[in-house]
């Protein structure tokens, strides 16, 4: 809400209570009977604590004046808190000075219910509190504009040791970490995309990055070079390094095995017979096999139905022809019925 609107609202409340003759116990001032502080807003920036004493002391003795100033520049922010020795003086100040004109500015005077007096801290206490809060991140980036009014520490040494300071000081962020090499090589560094530099938690060893197969394109071939020398690993199934490997037996056992067959790769006792070496089971199968061998196999043969199982549709357009046939028959039947109806009508006319 606009401060001038608040000033007018307070003046309306006071005028209405005065017209109605409301007692002090029922007045809105009784809500702040336990507070001797008043809030003063809209103060001209040139006024000092002495000027405020001169203006407000006419309604009672003032025991505390807190003119809020900027901690960096020391300039007034335009509002203050005053405390009277007698609480009844606050009622007089609010009723008489609210909306008053001081050096061309309308000031607002109102009760202050829960004001806590700010204890002034000495420089040593202020420094200790800043150190406890930590280093200012904006100061580490060189962007803090609060100066001495900042709540956080501006210690350049601490800023350099956190890794958030200047570029040359950020390397100290992970210097205490002795297990950095144990975490492995940074994959972003291997691809040439890591931007963390020395602050990265993972190793940036170029030699190790080259032997992992994750580095540059010419170094990725070294990923499996060690397996070429070591051969098949213990317990593996590499055919090139097995002494008992038999191509024919392995191929036949692979063809005949099912999913989850534990006998794969083991010599079987029974004789393996290729199914293709067996004779044809029927004459049709024999003819089909001969056609496949000679290249004269008709694919349409496999698309036909068996006469014993289902009917064979020789003509692809038979369905449309059947539909036309049924349609023509229904048309003839309808014409015949109409002709019979006309004949019956003519016979009746003759009788009449």
From Swiss-Prot:
Gene Ontology molecular function, alphabetical: RNA binding; transcription cis-regulatory region binding; zinc ion binding
Source taxon at top rank: Eukaryota
Domain spans labelled RRM: 36-114
Any Pfam family matching the protein: zf-CCCH_4
Cellular compartments per GO CC: nuclear speck
CDD domains given in the database record: RRM_ist3_like
One Gene Ontology term from the biological process aspect of the record: mRNA splicing, via spliceosome
Keywords: Coiled coil, DNA-binding, Metal-binding, Repeat, RNA-binding, Zinc, Zinc-finger
Protein name: Zinc finger CCCH domain-containing protein 42
Species of the source: Arabidopsis thaliana (Mouse-ear cress)
